[in-house]
A protein has these predicted regions:
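Substrate-binding/active-site clefts of carbohydrate-active enzymes
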Residues: 1-86, 90-108
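Conserved alpha/beta catalytic core and glycan-binding cleft of carbohydrate-active enzymes
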Residues: 85-87, 99-208
Length: 208
């Protein structure tokens, strides 16, 4: 649909008392000709090498160390909240920002960590009621801690472990479920470490 139709959809949801969350992807972008790859013939938004510049999906990774890229992403998110009146954003693939390419063995991406903190802090200053949600499957601490406490500044984090365990439990035959009760209770071991949001992720339920 058109931008105006999307605005109308969000407005209709609000009239019905339903909030709308924007799925926001600040990690990578498509390589299609109409996109940002080699925008002016040079790698402005992406890395200039394949090792860090190409994601596992074949898309281009944003280079978050560049101030202009940080501003571009911040202004894009602000635009969706301000002009379309979304109630918050769900940030995609946060683990790929916390760690280089999402690989913990490669270490923490300090530049991206700084970006996340500034990004969330900036949005909260302009939109205090906006809900900021992280899609993150790592054990990196402080994802939902305020930035002033050293955290990343998200309001909630998807509990992907709970989702996986629950789906696996119900995929197990009834005669075997008594041995797998721990899959229903394990999330309580870590549940108080962050402010978790329970969800069934679109990426997973599509597989049945």
């Amino acid at each position: 649909g058109t931008p105006d139709k999307l605005m109308k959809f969000v407005d209709m949801m609000h009239q019905a008392g339903i909030g709308v969350i924007m799925d926001f992807v600040p990690v990578h972008f498509a390589v299609d000709g109409y996109g940002l790859k080699l925008y002016d013939g040079t790698p402005l938004y992406e890395y200039d090498n394949k090792d860090t510049g190409e994601s596992e999906w074949g898309s281009c990774n944003f280079i978050h160390s560049r101030r202009e890229v940080q501003c571009f992403l911040q202004s894009a998110a602000n635009y969706w909240l301000e002009e379309y009146h979304f109630d918050g954003i769900r940030m995609d693939a946060v683990s790929r920002l916390i760690y280089w390419q999402g690989d913990e063995s490669r270490g923490v991406n300090d530049t991206a960590i700084d970006f996340l903190k500034a990004f969330n802090l900036g949005l909260k200053q302009r939109h205090p009621t906006a809900m900021l949600i992280a899609e993150d499957s790592t054990a990196y601490p402080g994802v939902t801690e305020p930035v002033w406490k050293g955290g990343l500044g998200f309001d909630y984090k998807w509990d992907l472990g709970w989702m996986h365990d629950t789906l696996e439990y119900f995929q197990t035959g009834p005669e075997y479920r008594s041995r797998d009760y721990h899959k229903l209770t394990f999330s309580m071991v870590y549940f108080w470490n962050e402010r978790y949001m329970l969800e069934y992720c679109h990426d997973e339920v599509v597989h049945g």
